[in-house]
């Protein structure tokens, strides 16, 4: 696994050793940064000064530091100012290029090109360079089979994990948020939102986690606003789409969502946690929120209303029905916990069976863990 992260204070000791070792033996280099002197102490001081710039990145393979990347911006182009790697292969290169593409898109560049002036090019990327020594990255550059995956809470029980893997879904675990309330730090629907099969949006703090685990063909945008543990900034991504409608409270939705889904008509609801409150399928919704129920029906979207409450959410009086599960066409509605433990199970099962939707549940409390996202 290739993991890219912002340069942080905790990385400076290890990175100084890395830079010191490679100072005369770079696979890629534009020019050696004059601030990175030969003396290791000077290197550490220089690196610490760069942390606040937020354009210096470290590259790991598993837990081993293998690279260092410095970016710069110039006339709507993203420049690789410096890149130092102690090994190179297609997997590493493409993960770096995928990160660069996300970075450009999240900064709303008109074009996605990267200059490599003075670099030595690996055979892997020579065919992708234009006559100005630039690389334009497109999704079809990433020759990957589109494997099925599910993003689930890192607190999910083994029964669910085995079920998903047994149905050929790769499991991606949620990020452990340090900005959210600890009781919902694992909740998928607070951290990441699916736009379509090839594009997702995630919170700023979770980007490097999801970029490491998501396939390279997925474009991963980042929220414009920073998530907090207070409403409305705790639910920037907690909205949903159905039949070309975006169901949300505009006061709590991140601007990036509105830009990416500008062609969808907005159904305005009072509920800021609209995804938490709703089971969303291709053709209908099941919700415990009366404002969502009434609003979507006005647009001729089929909806079912279920009683609120009686759902476990540690530290809270109750959880939300949408947070208990996720939907995909081949598996139906997949629950984190045991539907038999849900007070209103008969009504919920009635809705699902009326629509010929399969459902699966595991042996756990009927619990809200922040939805499951399938792709």
Placement of each model-derived feature along the sequence:
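A short helix-loop-beta-strand connector motif used in the catalytic cores of GNAT acetyltransferases and
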Residues: 42-58, 67
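Conserved beta-strand in the GNAT
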Residues: 58, 64-72, 79
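Conserved GNAT-fold acetyl-CoA-binding loop/helix
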Residues: 24-45
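Conserved acyl-CoA
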Residues: 95-111
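A short, internal acetyl-CoA/4′-phosphopantetheine-binding micro-motif in the GNAT/acyltransferase core
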Residues: 82-92
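Conserved beta-strand-loop-alpha-helix junction that forms the acyl-donor binding cleft
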Residues: 113-124, 134
């Amino acid at each position: 696994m290739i993991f890219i992260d912002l340069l942080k204070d905790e990385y400076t000791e290890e990175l100084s050793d890395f830079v010191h070792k490679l100072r005369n033996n770079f696979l890629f280099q534009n020019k050696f940064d004059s601030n990175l002197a030969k003396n290791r102490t000077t290197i550490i001081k220089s690196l610490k000064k760069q942390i606040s710039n937020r354009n210096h990145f470290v590259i790991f393979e598993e837990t081993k530091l293998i690279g260092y990347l410095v970016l710069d911006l110039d006339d709507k182009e993203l420049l690789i100012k410096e890149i130092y790697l102690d090994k190179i292969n297609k997997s590493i290169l493409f993960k770096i290029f995928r990160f660069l593409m996300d970075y450009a898109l999240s900064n709303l560049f008109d074009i996605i090109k990267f200059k490599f002036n003075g670099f030595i090019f690996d055979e892997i990327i020579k065919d992708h360079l234009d006559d100005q020594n630039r690389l334009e990255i497109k999704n079809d550059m990433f020759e990957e089979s589109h494997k099925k995956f599910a993003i689930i809470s890192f607190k999910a029980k083994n029964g669910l994990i085995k079920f998903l893997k047994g149905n050929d879904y790769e499991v991606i675990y949620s990020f452990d948020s340090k900005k959210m309330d600890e009781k919902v730090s694992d909740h998928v629907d607070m951290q990441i939102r699916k736009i379509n099969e090839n594009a997702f949006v995630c919170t700023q703090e979770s980007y490097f986690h999801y970029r490491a685990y998501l396939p390279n063909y997925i474009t991963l945008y980042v929220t414009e606003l920073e998530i907090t543990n207070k409403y409305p900034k705790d639910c920037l991504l907690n909205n949903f789409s159905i039949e070309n409608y975006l169901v949300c409270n505009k006061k709590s939705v991140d601007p990036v969502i509105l830009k990416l889904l500008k062609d969808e008509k907005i159904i305005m609801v009072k509920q800021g946690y609209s995804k938490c409150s709703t089971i969303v399928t291709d053709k209908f919704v099941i919700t415990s929120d009366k404002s969502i129920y009434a609003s979507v029906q006005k647009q001729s979207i089929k909806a079912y209303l279920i009683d609120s409450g009686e759902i476990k959410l540690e530290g809270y009086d109750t959880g939300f029905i949408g947070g208990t599960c996720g939907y995909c066409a081949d598996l139906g509605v997949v629950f984190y916990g045991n539907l038999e433990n849900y007070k209103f199970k008969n009504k919920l099962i009635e809705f699902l069976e009326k629509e010929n939707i399969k459902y699966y549940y595991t042996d756990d409390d009927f619990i809200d863990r922040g939805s499951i996202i399938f792709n």
